[in-house]
Design a protein with these regions (language model features):
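Glycine-rich oxoanion-binding loops at beta->alpha junctions
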Residues: 7-8, 63-119, 128, 169, ...
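N-terminal phosphate-binding or glycine-rich loops at protein starts, especially the Walker A/P-loop
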Residues: 9-66
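Short glycine-rich or small-residue beta-strand-to-loop segments that form or flank ligand, phosphate
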Residues: 14-24, 87-93, 119-125, 151, ...
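Short, ordered loop/turn segments at secondary-structure junctions
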Residues: 20-22, 53-58, 93-94, 126-127, ...
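Short glycine/serine/threonine-rich phosphate/pyrophosphate-binding segments
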Residues: 24-34, 60-61, 97, 104-107, ...
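Generic secondary-structure signature for well-ordered alpha-helical cores
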Residues: 36-47, 55-58, 62, 94, ...
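Accessory alpha-helical/coil subdomains and C-terminal extensions
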Residues: 112, 123-125, 131-146, 166-305
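C-terminal non-catalytic interaction/assembly regions of soluble proteins
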Residues: 269-419
């Protein structure tokens, strides 16, 4: 009797998936996981067709869809997607207003859902994308339209609540850590006093900058100083520390988050170009490294340069973490399974299992606990002087960058999928 009731609760129809926010080296692996999960559901007669919306909800409103079952007609093609960086379906930065503020948009989306018999909506993204999942799941429920809306996590910032870490972070962390290790080799060839400042992505959370300390796990030297937005940045202490460290190491490497703030709350990166905001209303940051470069030049007087890692942090699939890509695929598959099991208004989570050996399970959390929340680096991962990462922080980060992909090359260049 219970089995019959369960079967009757299954929704039959089409599914749609989209990608939103900043791309990563692993967001396509998550898309591949959704495709694989949807194909399994298709074999069971649950999902008829999986559509991909181009450019997120913007493409959805244009009904700009691609039939992913038809496009990915071989396992080899799906595997190639797993190794392709950026967002193959295209992305957007659109944040939905509330249904009260923009009733027309929601009514149009509901019309499109009904027209295309869409019963499953998967949205791969970060904080603001989870807000879209929250709003759509509530709207569908309030308008008596049976549909499962599931958030699928993605962000190199690693700042989503209710999950141990996020797909895309491990690969970006591997790139940052590797770049730091190689830079340390480069700056060490001269005996002259010099400072190299590397600016890493991270407006509100310093997870990616923290990964700059990972060269120590392979016997290397970590950057001399690491500054995260979770702690106030004191420019006077910064200069004092440089003068102190250069007594033993003339050439210093310093990692900073783009979102570090002065003690008065101002972003260091606002020192250039004034205050600007992006499409989500967040302060647009750039130039923290340049601001500190000028500070060191004026107050220390040694050779100094700043480097902004910028887009390669999230696009470097050639050095992606196998752990990250494997988990990203599993997250996508789990999203489909949870939806087909009747879950809605949730985000798939990665839950670390305790013990000496690293392993994870894939859970689900209420989307209302995640949307618009930010999970920063905890105090126990930052040293007492606020300029380095503790051993506990290293232990958390280290497993996430393990493993390398077997990438397919063509004429010396990695092959990618273009949808």
């Amino acid at each position: 009797m219970l089995e019959r009731k369960y079967k009757m609760s299954i929704l039959y129809g089409n599914a749609v998936v989209g990608q939103s926010g900043g791309p990563t080296a692993a967001i396509n692996a998550t898309l591949a996981g959704v495709i694989r999960g949807a194909l399994d559901a298709h074999e069971k007669g649950i999902i008829k067709t999986l559509y991909g919306m181009r450019n997120g909800v913007e493409g959805f409103l244009r009904e700009d869809f691609v039939d992913l079952f038809s496009f990915f007609d071989s396992d080899e093609k799906i595997t190639l997607l797993e190794h392709t960086p950026s967002a193959a379906l295209g992305s957007c930065r659109r944040k939905l207003k509330s249904h009260v503020e923009d009733a027309e948009t929601y009514a149009k989306m509901l019309e499109i859902f009904k027209k295309n018999d869409i019963r499953y909506f998967f949205y791969i993204g970060g904080n603001d994308s989870m807000d879209t999942v929250l709003k759509l799941s509530q709207y569908a429920s309030n308008h008596d339209y049976e549909m499962k809306v599931v958030g699928v996590p993605k962000t190199v910032d690693n700042d989503l609540a209710c999950t141990d870490h996020t797909p895309g972070f491990g690969s970006a962390a591997k790139y940052v850590a590797t770049t730091m290790k190689e830079l340390l080799c480069d700056i060490s060839v001269y005996s002259l006093k010099a400072v190299t400042i590397v600016e890493v992505m991270g407006r509100d959370a310093g997870w990616l900058t923290a990964s700059a300390a990972l060269p120590v796990i392979s016997g290397g030297r970590a950057p001399d100083l690491v500054y995260l937005p979770e702690r106030p940045f004191d420019p006077d202490k910064f200069i004092d520390k440089i003068n102190e460290l250069q007594k033993d190491h003339p050439a210093l490497l310093i990692a900073i988050s783009e979102g570090i703030k002065f003690p008065d709350g101002r972003y260091v990166g606002e020192g250039l170009g004034g205050r600007k905001v992006d499409a989500f209303g967040h302060v647009a940051l750039s130039g923290a490294g340049k601001v500190l470069e000028e500070l060191v030049k004026d107050r220390v007087g040694c050779k100094v340069r700043s480097i902004e890692l910028n887009l390669p942090q999230r696009a470097a699939a050639h050095i992606a973490s196998l752990t990250d890509i494997t988990e990203s695929v599993s997250v996508g598959k789990a999203a489909v399974k949870y939806a087909c099991d009747g879950k809605t208004g949730i985000m798939v989570t990665i839950d670390r299992v305790g013990g000496d050996d690293y392993s994870v399970t894939f859970g689900a959390a209420d989307i209302s606990k995640i949307a618009n929340a930010v999970r920063g680096v905890p105090d126990e991962y930052i040293n007492e002087s606020s300029d380095g990462i503790t051993e506990e922080g290293i232990r958390y980060l280290a497993p996430l960058i393990v493993g390398e992909l077997n990438i397919k090359y063509l004429n010396g260049m990695p092959e990618h999928v273009v949808i």
